[in-house]
């Protein structure tokens, strides 16, 4: 799976009517949902609300507000009129009290300067420790201690219909919160929609109907306790989908794993198979007389990669990983990211009407 680079320029048009970049407009110089489950969750939240007229969302907002920051970036870009300064903004979440902040890679990628604005009104210069275009997570370090670090919950325990509150700085309005529910889990969005450098899909995402807007990218999606369950990353604008409030967040488990790796090593490694893939659709299956109707077609193999070593060749269709059915390249990515470099995984590959098992030893790539 191959990966490229993004150069921040100016406000991007929406590509293919896809998702608007949450990191916000560069101010250059120049889901389906809740039903009964949601009602039960809301009722439970109301029972747990503090005394008086304070809603559960207000209490959640009070808890998370100190830990959500605004990330202001600038870079010098060339133009026919000479060097121009481009500015942008996003959001972030205080991860550790010793100065580490999690945000999106597409927020800080290519930035020459980073400034972090805290809820108390203070501003600190930030340094990008590292970013991961595969997951769109980055870590920024500020020279300050005793920061109000957020509490991170286990995103593996989430259920559709539970309360979700998004916190960030949409359009520069710091400390903004919106509420809704978790509308779906294990969602996948194409790589081009964040505007960052990833060329593989973002997978295993949380879908929410809590309003997420430009500038909220890198902010927090939290549960009823005020604990972070995800890092906001993208949204589908209603004008282009006919749907209202389709937002997406990177699960907290992914965000913290990647952040820890960046803090420790400056980069995150991901399992590498060494294949190029496209989704197998019914139309493609009919056109090329493929015996299966879904999966990920192997269009290319790195001759020096683990797939080649295992004997996988172009033209096969990956239909399962460790016995788990694969219906798309996103499914395959999600399944592989549950493993570590060095692990051996069994891939089921259909070719010429026959399914074969291949044992692939994953390499690391970051």
Residue ranges and their predicted role:
Residues 18, 51, 326:
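Conserved phosphate-coordination/catalytic loops
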Residues 32-286, 292-293, 303, 333, ...:
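Serine-dependent protease modules
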Residues 127, 138-141, 260-267, 308-313, ...:
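PDZ-domain C-terminal substructure recognizer with occasional recognition of PDZ-binding tails
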Residues 4-21:
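Bacterial N-terminal signal peptides that target proteins for export
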Residues 28-30:
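C-terminal motif of bacterial Sec signal peptides marking the signal peptidase cleavage site
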Residues 109, 158, 279-282, 289, ...:
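Short glycine/proline-centered loop/turn elements that form peptide/ligand docking sites
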């Amino acid at each position: 799976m191959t990966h490229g680079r993004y150069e921040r320029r100016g406000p991007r048009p929406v590509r293919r009517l896809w998702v608007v970049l949450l990191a916000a407009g560069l101010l250059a110089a120049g889901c389906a949902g809740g039903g009964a489950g949601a009602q039960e969750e809301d009722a439970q939240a109301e029972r747990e609300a503090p005394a008086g007229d304070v809603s559960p969302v207000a209490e959640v907002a009070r808890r998370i507000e100190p830990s959500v920051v605004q990330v202001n970036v600038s870079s010098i870009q060339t133009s026919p009129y000479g060097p121009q300064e481009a500015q942008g903004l996003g959001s972030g979440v205080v991860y550790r009290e010793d100065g580490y902040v999690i945000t999106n890679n597409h927020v800080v990628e290519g930035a020459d300067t980073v400034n972090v604005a805290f809820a108390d009104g203070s501003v600190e210069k930030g340094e990008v420790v590292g970013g991961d275009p595969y997951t769109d997570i980055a870590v920024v370090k500020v020279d300050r201690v005793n920061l109000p670090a957020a509490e991170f919950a286990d995103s593996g325990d989430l259920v559709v219909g539970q309360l979700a509150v998004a916190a960030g700085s949409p359009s520069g309005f710091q400390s903004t919160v919106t509420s809704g529910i978790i509308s779906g889990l294990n969602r996948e969005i194409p790589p081009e929609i964040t505007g960052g450098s990833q060329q593989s899909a973002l997978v295993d995402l949380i879908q929410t109907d809590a309003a997420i807007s430009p500038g909220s990218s890198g902010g927090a999606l939290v549960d009823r306790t005020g604990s972070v369950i995800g890092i906001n990353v993208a949204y589908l604008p209603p004008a282009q989908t006919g749907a209202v409030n389709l937002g997406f967040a990177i699960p907290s488990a992914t965000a913290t794993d990647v952040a820890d790796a960046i803090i420790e090593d400056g980069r995150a490694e991901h399992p590498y198979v060494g294949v190029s893939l496209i989704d197998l659709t019914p139309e493609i299956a009919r056109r090329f007389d493929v015996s299966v109707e879904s999966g990920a077609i192997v269009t290319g193999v790195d001759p020096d990669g683990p797939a080649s070593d295992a004997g996988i060749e172009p033209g096969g269709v990956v239909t399962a990983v460790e016995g788990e059915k694969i219906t798309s390249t996103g499914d395959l990515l999600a399944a592989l990211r549950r493993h570590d470099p060095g692990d051996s995984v069994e891939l089921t590959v259909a070719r010429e009407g026959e399914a074969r098992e291949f044992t692939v030893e994953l390499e690391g790539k970051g």
